[in-house]
Structures are given as C-alpha cells and as structure tokens.
Amino acid sequence: MAEPTATREQAQQRMAQLRGEISEHDYHYYVLDRPTISDAEYDALFRELQRLEAAYPDLVSSDSPTQRVAGTAQEGFEAVVHDTPMLSLDNAFEADDLVDFDRRIRDRLGVASVVYTGEPKLDGISLSLTYQDGELVRAGTRGDGHTGEDVTANVRTLRSVPLRLRGDGYPGRLEVRGEVVIRKEDFERLNQARLDAGERPFANPRNAAAGSLRQLDPRITARRPLTLFTFGVGDPLALGVESHWQVLECLAGWGFRTTAPLEHLEGVSACQAYRDRLIEERDALPFEIDGAVFKVDDLAVREQLGFTARAPRWALAFKLPAREATTVVEAIVPSVGRTGKITPLARLQPVEVSGVTVARASLHNADELARMDVREGDTVMVRRAGDVIPQITDVVLAKRPEGAQPWRFEERVQACPECGSAVQRIEGEAAHRCVGGLYCPAQREGAILHFASRRALDIDGLGEKIVEQLVAKGLVVDLADLFRLGHAQLAGLERMGDKSADNLLAALDRARSTTLARFLYALGIPHVGEVTARRLAEAAYGLMVAVPRGDRAALRAAAGLDAQTAITSEALLRVMAAPADDLEAIEDVGPVVARAIAGFFAEPHNRQVVDHLCAAGVHWPEPDPPEQAESVSSLAGRAFVVTGTLETMTRDEAKAAIEACGGRVTGSVSRKTDYLVAGADAGSKLNKARELGVEVVNESGLRELLAGAGA
C-alpha cells in the first residue's frame, strides 16, 4: 500500500519518477551491460512502484516496467501486416559472389568504389517493432515478409526492448527491425536447467529463441533469456539522416542494442577482410551468427539501387561455414565428470564442422539418450557451437544399420567406469552419478579443491595449479595423502619454492584440527552444503538411538567398519551408520538429501578415505550429547513453519522463541510439520498445511504454546 500521507498528486509524481529510474536501470543493465545499482536496490524500487500502482490502479501506465508481463495466456496469435515489407537478403557462399555483388553496384552507379557497413548476421528470429509517439504498440514476427504473427505481449517481456523510447527526435510512427537471440552462455544454462528437470533440451539457440517467442503464455517467455539486437528501421529516410550508420546511432540513442562488431568498409577488399575476421572471431562472440551482412551505407544511393522482387539490390548476406555436419556413431561410452556426473558420449567418425574436427558429442543423460534413441552405427547430425562439446541434433533413421541395438544406460553402466564405485540416480535428478567422490580419479581434483576450500578445511595455498600437479604426479591419490606430503615433494612443484612449501605444510597441519560440521562439508557429499553439514553435526546424537551411548563397536558394525578403523568420533559414526529414514528427520534434510548422505557412506571407497583421514590426524572436538533434562519442554523436537505477516513480532523473533523452547523451524510444510503458524496473507503454505492435516495456529495460538512450554 502507498504511504497514508501521500496525496494522489504526490503518488503520481513518485510513480513517474520510479518508472523513469527503473527504465534507466534496465537500459544500463540489459542494453549497455553496465549495471548502475545492486539487485537489492533495483528490487526495492520495483516493489515501491508495485505498491503505488496497487494503491492507485487508475494511474498505471502501459509503459510501466511492472506491465511487461501479461497475467494470462493467449489463445493464439493474430496476423500482423508490416508497414514496410521485411524482404529477404540475397545470399553469397563464395568469395566470387561478393566480388560480383560489388561489381554490379559499381556498374549501376558508375563509381569506382562503394562504402558499405559490415555487421554480423545473427542466427535468431527477425522482428518488427512499431512505436507510436515513442511507445511500443505492436511487435510482429517476419512471417512471409508481408504478414507475420502479433507477438506484442511476449516481446514486452524482453528487458532489452524499450516500452518507451529514450531521448527525442524519433518520428511519430517508427518501425524498428531486429533479431531476437539467446546468447551462448544463457543457452547453455537454459539447456542444463531443462536437462536437470528431465526436459528435452533445445537443439540450438535459434530454436530456443523461436520457441520462447511463440509461447501463448507471456509468463513463460519472460523466464527465457531473450535479447533483441536491432539492425535497421522500416523507413530510414523518415529519420532525416543520410546513412545506415546514422540510423544505427539513432537506434542506440533511443535505447536499443545494435549488433557488433559493426564496421565502415570501403570497397570489396575491406568486406572480404571483415568476413575473414568474423570467421576467426565467431567462437568468441557472445551470440551465434551464420553470416556477415554487407549494406550500402548511403541511403540516397540505396534509393537509386532499389529492389528486385524479393530482395534489396544494396545488401548481401555472406554465409559462413555450416555449424552442422553428418557423421557416424562408432561407439557410445560413459564419461565421468569432475562432479561425478556420468554422461553418455558418442565417439564419432571424425568430421569437420565449421573448421574444427569433431570426434565426440555429448548425449547428455540416460533420459535424453533414450529419447533420441541414438545407437552405435547410426548416421547422425552433429552441431558445434563455440567451446561447447558438440551435440547430436538428429538421427538419420533411413541410414540406420540393420541389427543396431538400443543403448540402455542402466544395463551398460552398473558401476563407475573410472573407479568401480556404485552409480546412483537421485529422485528428481536427470543425471546418474558416481558415489565414490573421495576415491574416483575423475573427481579427484575437484574433491581436493573442495576439501581445501575456505568454508571446508581452509587449506591456504592449495590452489588449482598445485592440485593439478599433485594429482598428475601421483602424489595425492586420496585426500589423506595431503597430510603425508613432505617439503621436498612440494618445493619441487612449479610455482613452489622453499617458503611456499613451508607455508603450505603449516596450513595442512592447521587443517588437521577442525569441527565435525566443517569435516562433513569438506567431504563433498552431494546436496550437503554448509547449513546441512552443521545440522548433521548438531543432530548426530539423535541418530541411531537404538545403539546406547558409547557403544562404538555397535556403531562401527552398523557403519560397515572393522574394529581397526581409525574413526573414533561417536558423532561421526552415528552419521555414517544412520539410515535414510533417520537422516530425513533432521531439519532441512529431505528425502533426496537423506538418500544422498546414506548412499555416500554406504560406498566402501568413501568410508575408506574417511578412515584414512582420521588416521592422518584429522580431528575435532566431539559435539556435546544433549543433556537428559529433568523436565522436557512440551515443544521439544516439534517442527514449526511460520508464514505470513505477524502483528506483534517478526518471523525471526517467532523463530527464536520457538527454538528457545526446543522446537525447530523449517521453511516448508510437510507431513513432518507439527504446527503451521499463520499470519496475515499466509498463502500457499496454509493451503498445503490444511491438505496434509497439519495443525494451524494463529499468532495468539503460538503465544499460548510458548507460554505452556515455559517461555
């Protein structure tokens, strides 16, 4: 709600100010890549504008940053007719094509040389944006060049598209042309998220951009990392400028991104050199390109040259070498990454793709392999983009050899191919993982770096380059070998002298003394971060309660350890021996995390490395067992969730009061929740609590519970 003292006029002024500030910050972040404020500061401005608009809904303007995303899905896309046709460009594939293009223009004009602009041809989706008096009123896809689809609601969600133009000097009606793309790094993150969620990845950034732009629900488009780069306008002469270069300068001044690298080029030789540079720099560009575009820069000269039936005479698209090629799958093999993820890889008959020889391609995971049904001997389409491992995008079924058999991951990969440890697929994950994280050679460097990290054992001076050498020379095979390193071994490494070796040995010696929480975190158990490791250490004596205190022999047996083990910490033994059901009862440990912990310690190789670490002198003060109090609080061990807005205390204060009485506060409602404390605007957690039959109390009810527990 707006401040009660704010008048309508004050609110209107503040809303206009906030719209301007937020739009300015969007421009710096999404167009210039130069953020001017922190995310928290931006969010505060955005929330303030939302509150004011909620208080004065009749003052909400269509160009407000809060109005980018429509709240409902569309039933379909209306047809939209372009003010000026969006014609194709003639294509060139050979150097002679470019020479002929330049010669035809010079002959037609009767001049010795022509000035062109050179720009990358982005591999995305072409759009036409129409602005009326500076405000975005329509966005359409290219379609057949004359008629496209109205995607205005979706395009409004793109932060690189100004809802209102910046500056001044624009005509009353302006049609802007551009290309919507997904940058390479955003595409990799998007596909990884889809794979992690068990969804089919996009074949390439162009397909991802096209699919994202044509969503019927703009809220889905808003979650996709789309960016617009502009390359011109429908009617450049309406801007009152003389060159294409000046058109692009106008667009940049009005708040748009333009493509880069953009160059002025005089003559065909300069164009050829620009094309060659683009080929060399292609992998370093943040977006995919499929060519270079050359346009006559002088707008008056363009008018003289005119158009053919399908394309302008003054522009040419020079295609770059293809990113895809056809080859044969010689074998499918599992590959173990640094985090233990096991990925099926296709070994290919070597094939050249855009100037690079490709001999392998990722098949992502078991589900994706089964969906694509790639088989050994198949002919496949392979795509390469930048430094990313090439991807198989399609199988040519017509060329499948007779007798080719499906490659079933679970049948072929029953143990880690690197170390023989068990393979685990945790519910909700798409990936299979080797559970021998402390033992597996493929994971060794990553395991050591995590073990030595600041929040783990904090071994100062043990960086990536040193770890690479230690592993390559065979000096560290398991983590305990770190504590057996000598001065001569360390001093002989690159970038290490006598003093550095002494410092690292001292850091290793200090690291022997730690805490159980840090030690558990340092082991790199999947899904176990600092908070979960601390919860495990604190709750250790509440695990394996059927085993009496002090009975380490029974705990060793339950944990799969023999009597000679160097592990003497009862708290650690209880964690190692605990079944998933016990672990799941710990705060912040759900079923997925519980199974990951139990699976980690069930792997004999991991237990062996933990044993070796304790034998090497890694130790910690034993956590104090919980005292058996004469009178136990009625809230001891009870699980609470606090949601909504409380009137007489903050949620942090409520949490502190509950924990002081022995209760615990979690962030989500489950069948293990005893009480939901519901304040105002409780929302979905209240609904879930009711569905599960969890007892719901208001703030007054919480105070009664606390009073009854002696608070």
Curated annotation (Swiss-Prot):
Q: Where is the BRCT domain?
A: 630-711
Can you list the disulfide-bonded cysteine pairs? none
Q: Which family does it belong to?
A: Belongs to the NAD-dependent DNA ligase family. LigA subfamily.
Q: What is its EC number?
A: 6.5.1.2
| Cofactor(s) required for function per UniProt | Mg(2+); Mn(2+)
Which one Pfam family would you cite for this protein? BRCT
Name its GO BP terms in alphabetical order.
DNA repair; DNA replication
Q: What class of enzyme is it?
A: ligase
Q: What is this protein called?
A: DNA ligase
- Catalytic residues (UniProt): 121 (n6-amp-lysine intermediate)
Binding residues annotated for NAD(+), in chain numbering: 39-43, 88-89, 119, 142, 179, 295, 319
Say what the protein does. DNA ligase that catalyzes the formation of phosphodiester linkages between 5'-phosphoryl and 3'-hydroxyl groups in double-stranded DNA using NAD as a coenzyme and as the energy source for the reaction. It is essential for DNA replication and repair of damaged DNA.
| Record field: catalytic activity | NAD(+) + (deoxyribonucleotide)n-3'-hydroxyl + 5'-phospho-(deoxyribonucleotide)m = (deoxyribonucleotide)n+m + AMP + beta-nicotinamide D-nucleotide
The alphabetized UniProt keywords are: DNA damage, DNA repair, DNA replication, Ligase, Magnesium, Manganese, Metal-binding, NAD, Zinc
Binding positions (Zn(2+)): 416, 419, 434, 440
Q: Name one GO molecular function term.
A: DNA binding
Which PROSITE patterns does this UniProt record tie to the protein?
BRCT, DNA_LIGASE_N1, DNA_LIGASE_N2
User: InterPro entries in the record, alphabetically?
Assistant: BRCT_dom, BRCT_dom_sf, DisA/LigA_HHH, DNA_ligase, DNA_ligase_AS, DNA_ligase_CS, DNAligase_adenylation, DNAligase_N
